[in-house]
Amino acid sequence: MDCAAALLPGFHPNYLLCPSRHFSSLLPKTDLSSPLKFQLQNKQLSLASSHGFSPVICNATLSDTYSETVELADIDWDNLGFGFLPTDYMYNMKCAQGESFSNGELQRFGNIELSPSAGVLNYGQGLFEGLKAYRKEDGNILLFRPEENALRMRLGAERMCMPSPTVDQFVDAVKATVLANKRWIPPVGKGSLYIRPLLMGSGAVLGLAPAPEYTFLIYVSPVGNYFKEGVAPIHLIVEDNLHRATPGGTGGVKTIGNYAAVLKAQSAAKEQGYSDVLYLDCVHKKYLEEVSSCNIFVVKGNLIFTPAIKGTILPGITRKSIIDVARTLGFQVEERLVHVDELLDADEVFCTGTAVVVSPVGSITYHGERVPYNEGGVGAVSQQLYSALTRLQMGFIKDNMNWTVELS
């Protein structure tokens, strides 16, 4: 039964029916080798998958303004960029310092009210996550590894002295928000619904201290490609004067302040015609860290290597998934220190992240020297990994990795 169909006028149930993770151990071995071109994001696809699913209860209260519209939103699905489009509903849940989150609810999307003395505004006490929902040809919806986002938020909350939702609360809230906004999920092959969970110190605090109250909020927006180049190769410049993170800092968690700190270098790079910035470590200034909002991978023959997670690099969920997919496909993958000079003779370089998935790098400029890759095209390894992961995310192959969560 569809979750909204069970609602009666005037009643305010405290649940939504949400399908649970399906058990991929019953499915055939995942085929990660079949091709799927980068250009498929801009074309209608005819592939489908038939996963099973079962209902579970989500602890979300529906506000009295909740209603359901089954038709797709009237927007230009063929020209989605990575910009914000307001949707219908957002999810809101609060708790006091020292207590636990409970009793979240779906509300009409709109502005929120914060004290000028809120901890998030004065001291940057906040985290965010990002994940996506995809529409399948049978009308069902796929989420990609939402429990990983929940776990990462919990780790970040501990670092930032904040309470956080449990993994189940986080995942159930994501499901509820996606289903409430399902008319905004792009048609197959047109994009995805970007999901943005926020955790912030919303209570008023004047002296430097953890906020007395916290808000967990989720909003969503339909999106296309993150980079303006779309799926064409991007061009990076290495930054060795400004740094994204420092040892002992917060570079390994998804705190909001990490991203404001990269805007100066990123803006300067874009003014020079580059897509983004590749940062080096702040101690030796010679080891790769990450791009402004993406992890970085280097390819040499059958070897793929990426900077190790050591406290200054965000443990990306797409990064983690690509490592597993690459090993499944027979590549040797190393997580280690990567010297900037290793870019000079690399076969390919690519970035990974929720927003970009896999983004091939066409060139990297370091100290005025431009190093091109793949003659301006998409490298074979980047293409293969992109194909394998997106086929799984979009439900075109059965998920033997047990990574997707299906909603009806």
UniProtKB/Swiss-Prot annotation:
Alphabetical list of NCBIfam families matching this protein: ilvE_II, PRK13357.1
The cofactors required by this protein are: pyridoxal 5'-phosphate
Query: What does the entry state regarding organ or tissue expression?
Result: Expressed in lupulin glands and leaves.
Organism, by scientific name, is Humulus lupulus
Question: What gene name does this entry carry?
Answer: BCAT2
PANTHER family documented for this protein: AMINO ACID AMINOTRANSFERASE, BRANCHED-CHAIN-AMINO-ACID AMINOTRANSFERASE 3, CHLOROPLASTIC-RELATED
Q: Which reaction(s) does the protein catalyse, per the Swiss-Prot or TrEMBL entry?
A: L-isoleucine + 2-oxoglutarate = (S)-3-methyl-2-oxopentanoate + L-glutamate; L-leucine + 2-oxoglutarate = 4-methyl-2-oxopentanoate + L-glutamate; L-valine + 2-oxoglutarate = 3-methyl-2-oxobutanoate + L-glutamate
Q: PROSITE patterns annotated for this entry?
A: AA_TRANSFER_CLASS_4 (PS00770)
List the EC numbers from the record. Answer: 2.6.1.42
Please name the InterPro entries in this protein's record.
Answer: Aminotrans_IV, Aminotrans_IV_CS, Aminotransferase-like, B_amino_transII, BCAT-like_C, BCAT-like_N, BCAT_family
Give residues annotated as binding pyridoxal 5'-phosphate. Answer: R152, E290
Q: Which residues form the active site?
A: K254 (proton acceptor)
| An example Gene Ontology biological process | L-leucine biosynthetic process
Residues modified to N6-(pyridoxal phosphate)lysine: K254
Keyword vocabulary terms for this entry: Amino-acid biosynthesis, Aminotransferase, Branched-chain amino acid biosynthesis, Chloroplast, Plastid, Pyridoxal phosphate, Transferase, Transit peptide
User: What span is annotated as transit peptide?
Assistant: 1-58
The beginning of the lineage is: Eukaryota, Viridiplantae, Streptophyta, Embryophyta, Tracheophyta
Q: What else is known?
A: Branched-chain amino acids are synthesized in chloroplasts, whereas the degradation takes place in mitochondria.
Role, per record: Converts 2-oxo acids to branched-chain amino acids. Shows no kinetic preferences corresponding to anabolic or catabolic functions, but likely involved in BCAA biosynthesis.
The keyword Metal-binding is assigned to this record: no
Compartments it resides in:
Plastid, Chloroplast
Spell out the protein name for this chain. Answer: Branched-chain amino acid aminotransferase 2, chloroplastic
Any one GO cellular component localisation term in the record: chloroplast
Family designation: Belongs to the class-IV pyridoxal-phosphate-dependent aminotransferase family.
Tell me the route in metabolism or biology where this protein functions.
Amino-acid biosynthesis; L-isoleucine biosynthesis; L-isoleucine from 2-oxobutanoate: step 4/4; Amino-acid biosynthesis; L-leucine biosynthesis; L-leucine from 3-methyl-2-oxobutanoate: step 4/4; Amino-acid biosynthesis; L-valine biosynthesis; L-valine from pyruvate: step 4/4
List the transmembrane segments: none
List, in alphabetical order, the Gene Ontology terms for molecular function in this entry.
L-isoleucine-2-oxoglutarate transaminase activity; L-leucine-2-oxoglutarate transaminase activity; L-valine-2-oxoglutarate transaminase activity
